[in-house]
A protein has these predicted regions:
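Redox-cofactor-proximal catalytic regions of oxidoreductases
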Residues: 47-104, 587
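Flavin (primarily FAD) cofactor-binding/catalytic cores of flavoenzymes
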Residues: 1-59, 103-631, 638
Length: 638
């Protein structure tokens, strides 16, 4: 037995940091391989442990999760294939029913619960994990930030905290989530111009932290972003200020009754349209999609390739298109068998036989459809305003409102919607894309294409609850929201004394306001990080940025040199998540998990899903076992 406890610091105690804590306590616990090993686990989290920044239990009660209650969990279950001891705990639904019966009475698995409720559940889960740890495991909470890390004697690490504490530990796990970013040059210039002219600019960031109180009732506000952050901030600015939605509008649509305290929002985004609604059927959980083309064998073929030799658009995208297109046409012909000149089985066979040609802009069955509008055209879905121009914002708004109502109809009857069938397929392939990315086989240029696909997939398959789209349409009808169009160019007009926005989507005068709300969350980019810990790691050489291999294979394929393309990630070994130093050497005792490694892994912000062999728990277990294995304590040393 060692003379002193094994020391581990976990930086960040949101869902991922909490998962690492749970896996550490399980592997150190009575049934684990490191049973009876004294340990001290330091949890560094300035916010509520378990909930972290995103799931703050004190955030506005109006904000909803974008996933359904039946999918949410903080604990592994018996579907999780991991080496460590099997443990379990209540899902969100089970917690609400058995441990907090008054927290969400009547909550159903298919409903989208409140984000604050999820935060309270995660905080409870963290407390339960802490309480149930074996008596020889000491868990110490540090309600502050980590600001620096360096080497200490005996191969240990010294973690410096913002309150002046210095922790000397055997291993550190970085689970920091979304940290603050410095503005990109163009955004910094816009913010500086706004300050010079006394304008209100709310920069991009976490929606619950935005100073929305600075936006005055009736004041015009330009808004950039129509994705998930937008819907959160829209809710706070409307129903959060006393407005009400009544379910007595035409065709059962909601009608908005303003409180008079709302600002007037003029919103636009890159696409110019909001994310599409998630399916939402009363009394039924969302149905999944069974993979046919982008299956395990396809993943195995791609991941067996040499680093940097797989082109995303040439080799991965065709598999995605085949999967989504087949789902589209299968549903189309189930709902409208007469839509094609061929029988359904023959058309689907022809589509499947086309192979990789489905991803290069040609549709192998288009000539057999009576109506060109029935084609599966992913690029048209991605650019819905391409080639369209409207006389003014009023004409565009009427068109967009009708589009939202059509999307709502599809979301409420997804089994009859080719679009929602394709969306389910796109959601299903994301796990396959994650495996390909983690293998390090994509070419450097593919990472730009991968960034595009992430945006496209989010727009199609990871949108808000359908109820939020219904509310947005009602807010448009009530005159609270107006739409500017695609790619609005925002500048500061010194003569006019305000922001000015122009979009090629609409003719007529530009949109003007003295306030600008950036309703989006910047992607993780190590080069722009404002986090002193991450920046210090790179500056000291303990860590390095990740670069992807170039098309010629001359890049690092998961490293930091050789002429590759920077992905914005902290460089780690894909398999065990050990941080690589400036020379590319994996550090034995420093690990990173989740958002900071977006680029080495993909879609890292996704949460754990119950009964789905969640990757988050598998990675947390692998990290915990590597941490314990890297110390001088071994399972056979007891």
């Amino acid at each position: 037995m060692t003379a002193r406890p094994v020391g581990v610091a976990v930086v960040g105690a949101g869902p991922r940091g909490t998962a690492v804590l749970e896996r550490l306590t399980a592997n150190l616990g009575p049934s684990g391989p490191w049973a009876d090993t004294p340990a001290e686990v330091h949890i560094v989290e300035p916010r509520t442990p378990g909930a972290g920044r995103v799931w703050d239990p004190g955030q506005p009660e109006q904000l909803l999760m974008n996933t359904v209650a039946g999918h949410a969990t903080a604990f592994p279950d018996d579907t999780v294939r991991m080496a460590g001891p099997a443990t379990t705990g209540p899902t969100l639904m089970e917690w609400a029913r058995d441990h907090a019966p008054g927290a969400a009475p009547g909550l159903q698995p298919w409903e989208h619960p409140r984000r604050a409720l999820m935060g309270r559940y995660l905080a409870w889960a963290h407390e339960r994990i802490t309480r149930s740890a074996a008596p020889y495991i000491r868990i110490v909470a540090h309600p502050t930030r980590a600001i620096g890390l360096d080497e200490a004697p005996e191969g240990r690490l010294r973690l410096r905290l913002d309150d002046g504490t210095a922790l000397v530990v055997d291993a550190v796990v970085l689970a920091t989530g979304h940290t603050d970013q410095r503005p990109a040059p163009r955004e910094g210039e816009l913010a500086a111009a706004a300050r010079r002219h006394g304008l209100t600019h709310l920069p991009p960031g976490h929606p619950a932290e935005a100073r929305l109180d600075l936006l005055q009732p009736g004041e015009p506000v330009l808004v950039r972003g129509l994705a998930l952050n937008f819907f959160d901030q829209l809710t706070v600015l409307t129903s959060g200020r006393g407005g009400r939605f009544e379910q007595d509008g035409p065709a059962g649509r909601p009608r908005y009754l303003p409180s008079g305290r709302e600002p007037r929002l003029l919103a636009g985004s890159g696409r110019g349209v909001p994310y599409l609604a998630r399916p939402q059927v009363q009394g039924r959980m969302p149905t999944g999609h069974s993979l046919r083309f982008f299956d395990a064998a396809a993943v195995e073929r791609l991941t067996a390739r040499e680093p940097g030799t797989v082109g995303f658009m040439a080799e991965v995208w065709p598999l995605i298109v085949r999967e989504a297109g087949a789902a589209w046409y299968r549903t189309l012909l189930e709902v409208r068998p007469g839509a094609a000149r061929l029988p359904a089985a023959a058309l689907l066979d022809r589509y499947a036989a086309a192979g990789d040609r489905t991803g290069v802009g040609t549709d192998p069955v288009a000539e057999h459809l009576y109506d060109p509008a029935d084609r599966f055209d992913p690029f048209a879905l991605d650019r819905p305003l391409e080639g369209r121009r409207f006389r003014d914002r009023a004409e565009f708004g009427a068109w967009l409102a009708e589009r939202m109502y059509e999307d709502l109809d599809a979301a409420r009857a997804p089994e009859r919607s080719p679009l929602k069938a394709a969306a389910a397929a796109i959601a299903a392939v994301k796990g396959q894309v994650r495996r390909v990315v983690a293998a390090g086989v994509l070419s450097g240029s593919s990472y730009r294409e991968l960034s595009w696909f992430r945006s496209f997939g989010a727009h199609i398959a990871s949108g808000p609850p359908a109820s939020r789209i219904a509310e947005l349409a009602a807010l448009y009808e009530a005159g609270v929201v107006e739409f500017m169009g695609a790619r609005p160019a925002v500048t500061v007009d010194a003569a006019a004394g305000g922001f000015v926005a122009m979009s090629a989507t609409t003719d007529g005068p530009p949109a003007t306001a003295r306030a600008l709300l950036d309703a989006w969350l910047p992607g993780a980019d190590l080069a722009l990080s404002a986090d002193p810990l991450l920046r210090g790691l790179v500056a000291s050489g303990l860590a390095r940025p990740h670069t992807a291999a170039s098309n010629s294979g001359s890049g690092s394929g998961g490293g930091g040199g050789g002429g590759g393309i920077a992905t914005g990630a902290l460089d780690v070994c894909p398999s065990d998540l050990r941080v690589r130093d400036a020379a590319g050497r994996p550090h034995l005792r420093l690990f990173a998990f989740g958002v900071p490694v977006e680029g080495v892994h993909w879609n890292t912000a996704i949460g754990a899903r119950a009964r789905a062999n969640a990757e988050m728990f598998r990675q947390a277990d692998a990290i915990a076992r590597s941490v314990l294995g890297a110390t001088r304590v071994r399972p056979d040393s007891r």
